[in-house]
């Protein structure tokens, strides 16, 4: 009974960290709207928060795996949280710089540094959370089921982030980084609280193999893992790209109030929440391969419909005027709702891909998790590519980037994920 209680305590902590990752990471998308309007800059430059946050994964991915191998999951989580506290504090400071219009370069530079440091934290925590949930669940379908359960709370935190930021921004054309202070303070408080709780909690951990270059080579020698790492690289372009450019399109091109846009984009993450509930309930019965095959096909269908749906067919959607606390109805193109439904599909992609990619890796699992996290920097690359396409030919046509990513995930599920060899 004692061991069981300890295990559940570890599960609860890992799930709480999963939620924190979503809240802090998703601050970057509404912040991009603020930055674009405050600086009157292009879509490519407006994504500096996402670039900083996700490029950090490239730098920290493998070192994070090494930290786990050397110090264990608990100490590594504490290191990550300490770094996160610093990153959030720097982002907050960027909004406190006087005369932001005259010092725009300084404001954006400080914010970028803060986002980059916060990205270190997100990378480290991801390296801790995913393998620990997989291990605590017993691996296989059961491990995937526990990852999907953690994903439910991850999506809930994302929904809260967008609704909160929609309320804080109000009028996107006049918003400043300092308007996001309450959200940043919430994130800072959560980090501090989590640090204290984890420091006081005993977590039983599996033994880790010493980190050697041969371990990295050993993990990459597994074809299904190498292709899975690329799948995560491209998957990030779907998960973040779809809601990000819905927000930019509705705010910057259609001029829909930020309060309504925040509610709309929150629907995407609410769809992820629903999908993860479903994924958690059937994860022990349905294989990851079947899940990813199904949702990849659905993503292709939904994104293509969203791109080609007539823009003059409108659907009324309720938003909130947070100044007067009244409901405001806004006409939105029907294709936007197809994009939002993609959240149902992305809800199970991360856990499913991770589960397939680390299957049979044995002693290479810890370092493989670090390599996996490194590939999350694909979000920065895919955001840059999609933003460039959006600047060149428009927001809607930029979704061809998402179509390409979804097509690769379908290939990985059907062909690339098959395990050719197993380790003890």
Region spans (language model):
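C-terminal ends and interior cores of transmembrane alpha-helices
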Residues: 82-104, 298-328
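Helix-to-loop junctions at the C-terminal end of transmembrane segments
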Residues: 60-75, 275-288, 313-314, 390
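Central cavity-lining transmembrane alpha-helices of secondary-active solute carriers
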Residues: 48-68, 266-278, 378-381
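Extracytoplasmic
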Residues: 9-41, 126-130, 242-250
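Intracellular juxtamembrane helix-capping segments at the cytosolic ends
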Residues: 124-138, 346-362
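Extracytoplasmic gate region of multi-pass secondary transporters
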Residues: 28-32, 221-266, 274
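Helix-loop-helix hairpin linking two adjacent transmembrane segments in secondary transporters
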Residues: 130, 143-201
